[in-house]
Design a protein with these regions (language model features):
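Short glycine/acidic-enriched loop and turn motifs that connect beta-strands
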Residues: 130-134, 177-179, 225, 268-271, ...
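Repeated scaffold domains used in trafficking and secretory/extracellular systems
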Residues: 157-164, 204-212, 248-255, 292-301, ...
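Blade-level signature of beta-propeller repeat domains, shared across WD40, Kelch, NHL, RCC1
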Residues: 369-400
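An edge-strand/N-cap motif at the start of beta-rich repeat modules
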Residues: 110-151, 399
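Extracellular/lumenal mature domains of secreted and surface-exposed proteins
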Residues: 21-120
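Surface loop/turn motifs at the tips and blade-to-blade linkers of beta-strand repeat domains
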Residues: 150-157, 194-204, 240-246, 287-292, ...
Length: 400
């Protein structure tokens, strides 16, 4: 009897052991949703820049982006403009296919949009004409009392044009009287006459006034049109030949990198005057305001406004000397300021403080003039710098 009970217990134990060790079929778990993305930025991440986001999320049926700058999107791969500097936390939130506890529905990254002026100094460059000759000058814009630093002396006499190459930290000055273009370091040192009308092969520098830098070239206006050369003055050539057709003598110019247009004022002392634009390839010449006697030009491409110093002249719409503002197409012309008894040859904008500068001259060459600073609509003018004879001017951020 005891043997029977023993064998029954043994059989029951064996049956239980076999049942308890049987493997359970688990199957394949549902796929999870994992949020992820990458990005690339134009302009080396310097503001303003466009950032392209590439959604690399797994098993997501929807996306919501928060870019940390007030913008959001539900696009799969959005492209976003960042025009402010700083650190921005970008968060992608995905909508899952299955509601699983092991989903990873959010992914965040910090994007650094860099300051384009980091390591640079804001400077107002200007030229002057004196009894003993002309020169270039610079004032660091630091909200303190303006302190003028003179360039190293040259043989300049009437420096009517200035352009700054911020990429290479160089300053170019044209001299109408000498017939030359000079190049300086950004601190006003190391002057070099890179073009001279008296040098064989450089005769086309002639009577230069307006000038700008574009890429690896300088462009200047003089009798007969627009001319250009390499940044070191080599290979001078006529670029847009206007000859005796308006604009016969561009005396101040500015280039718009967005539209590819050159905006200019044409001399009226000896020619037909007018405010024009022309495409960089010479096509599309347009006269917006005919016959005006403009001597200085500054265009705010962001707001679409043009500022000009204009003399009243016969046959034009301007009947009173002054500083004028209009739309970039010449419409809405109105006077916003005054200039002195002699011509104003320079205007420029400080975009950090939203201020317009222009020269105010009493005599041709005595230091009895001033640089006026005002709001961009001409209001609240102030005598910013006195005891000077200002001519051309430009505000830039540059490495000194």
């Amino acid at each position: 009897m005891k043997k029977i009970i023993f064998y029954l217990i043994l059989a029951l134990f064996t049956l239980t052991l076999g049942t308890g060790c049987k493997k359970k079929e688990l199957g394949t778990p549902p796929a999870s949703t994992i949020a992820n993305f990458t990005y690339t930025a134009t302009n080396n991440g310097v503001a303003p820049c466009e950032v392209t986001f590439t959604n690399t999320s797994i098993n997501a049926k929807g996306s919501f982006w928060d870019f940390g700058n007030g913008q959001t999107s539900t696009e799969v791969d959005p492209v976003i403009l960042f025009d402010s500097i700083g650190f921005f936390t970008v968060k992608l939130t995905c909508t899952p296919v299955n509601n699983l506890y092991y989903n990873q529905l959010e992914k965040s990254m910090i994007i650094n949009v860099k300051d384009p002026n980091a390591g640079l100094t804001q400077v107002l460059y200007f030229t002057s004409r004196g009894p003993s000759g002309g020169n270039g000058h610079m004032v660091i814009l630091d909200d303190g009392v303006p302190k003028v630093q003179d360039f190293e002396a040259t043989d300049m006499e009437r420096p009517y044009g200035i352009a700054v190459d911020t990429a290479h930290s160089k300053v170019y000055i044209t001299d109408y009287s000498v017939g030359a273009i000079y190049r300086f370091n950004s601190d006003g040192k190391n002057p070099l006459k890179i073009l001279d009308v008296n040098v064989a092969g450089q005769e086309i520098v002639g009577d230069p006034e307006g000038i700008f830098v574009l890429g690896d070239k300088i462009y200047w206006g003089r009798t007969g049109g627009i001319y250009r050369a390499n940044l070191d003055g080599t290979n001078p050539e006529i670029f847009i030949n206007t000859g005796s057709t308006p604009p016969e003598y561009p005396i101040d110019m500015q280039y718009d990198t967005t539209s590819g247009k050159i905006y200019l004022v044409n001399d009226k002392t000896d020619y037909s005057g007018g405010y024009f634009s022309v495409n960089l390839d010479g096509t599309g010449l347009t006269e917006y305001i005919p016959a005006i006697d403009g001597t200085a030009l500054e265009v705010d491409f962001a707001t679409g406004k043009t500022y000009m110093a204009i003399y009243a002249s016969t046959g034009s719409s301007v009947t009173e000397n002054g500083i004028y503002m209009c739309n970039i197409d010449g419409t809405g012309l109105s006077k916003i300021g005054d200039f002195g008894s002699k011509a104003t040859w320079g205007m420029t904008i400080d975009y950090k403080r939203n201020k317009l500068f222009w020269g105010y001259k009493v005599s041709n060459s005595d230091p009895d003039g001033k640089i006026i600073r005002a709001n961009l609509d001409g209001s609240s003018p102030e005598d910013w710098l006195t005891g000077v004879s200002p001519h051309a001017m430009q505000v830039v951020w540059i490495k000194l």
